Amino acid sequence: MLQPKKTKFRRQQKGRAKGNAQRGNQLAFGSFGIKALETKWITGRQIEAARIAVTRYMQRQGQIWIRIFPDKPITRKPADVRMGKGKGAPEGFVAPVTPGRIIIEAEGVSYEIAKEALRLAAQKLPITTKFVVRRDYDIQNQNA
């Protein structure tokens, strides 16, 4: 499961992700990708499930890049505990995602394989996504 090796503080305030993604909103490594269309927290387990779905469908061909990392700690109090008495214990980590953020990129496979692999990955995520292709990618003359 994805999580930071070390954090400065064990707990963090919830905060609110507002607006669209200002960085990480364009394809940087691959020719294909999935872009978030809504704001949500994505856990490390969800990212890992999406990664496994992509690699299984692509049969270890090509290359993928995970563009988000869960570095925000989430706390939870046990069941049947009254309000107060401090913040709960750290439970896991999430990656806050805003609209426009590229989540996964792929390269080295055909357009059809990449589209289906990233569709399977998008089903594992709790947000609506959009399949994006690099502007200078030529679908007619693909050599994958």
UniProtKB/Swiss-Prot annotation:
InterPro entries: Ribosomal_uL16 (IPR047873), Ribosomal_uL16_bact-type (IPR000114), Ribosomal_uL16_CS (IPR020798), Ribosomal_uL16_dom (IPR016180), Ribosomal_uL16_sf (IPR036920). Keywords: Ribonucleoprotein, Ribosomal protein, RNA-binding, rRNA-binding, tRNA-binding. The keyword Ribosomal protein applies. Gene3D superfamilies: Ribosomal protein L10e/L16 (3.90.1170.10). GO terms for biological process: translation. Residues 1-17 have a biased composition (Basic residues). The keyword Cytoplasm does not apply. GO terms for cellular component: cytosolic large ribosomal subunit. Transmembrane segments: none annotated. CDD domains: Ribosomal_L16_L10e. It comes from the Bacteria. Residues 1-22 are annotated as: Disordered. One of its GO terms (molecular function) is tRNA binding. NCBIfam families: rplP_bact. Binds 23S rRNA and is also seen to make contacts with the A and possibly P site tRNAs. Belongs to the universal ribosomal protein uL16 family. Part of the 50S ribosomal subunit. This is Large ribosomal subunit protein uL16. It comes from Bacteroides thetaiotaomicron (strain ATCC 29148 / DSM 2079 / JCM 5827 / CCUG 10774 / NCTC 10582 / VPI-5482 / E50).
